[in-house]
Amino acid sequence: KVLSRPYLMRRGYWYVGLAHLAYKLLRTGIEVLFYPDFHLQLMSTTVLEPRDVVVCISFSGSTKQILELAELVQSEGSTVVSITNYRRSPLVKHSDILLLTCSSENPFMSGAAASVIAQIAVIDALFIGLAMHNPEHSTKFIQKTADTIKSQKV
């Protein structure tokens, strides 16, 4: 499948992981659309094309809003990549590609560092896989973005 632009969507505390993924993809020259607001995420589904890829992150995989987004994305014929902690979650039914984290949370630790770290580990593995798929392109843009932000250091 030829990738157009990845869209990144999440609910709750998962902003950290998607911001990390947006940063990593941009470093390799992949333009990313990242809408932190749920209404913007909903509206963005109306402009999806079949070659677009949407990354949805939900620890439980059962958040109503992320399920609605994934269902809308699939109805547009786009690919849904889901990152969740539960193989049997409702989100899996709306996923074309499933990436699982391995972490535990309890009611007192919602959004705990352990779950975010597990998520970032999966995101880093995804990033490395994408970068290795086209190393010349990735290396070029990693260097180009490094040169661009180098001027911001004293």
Per-region residue spans from a language model:
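Glycine-rich phosphate-binding loops that contact phosphosugars or nucleotide phosphates
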Residues: V2-A121, A125-H133
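A short, charged, Gly/Pro-tolerant segment at domain boundaries
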Residues: E136-V154
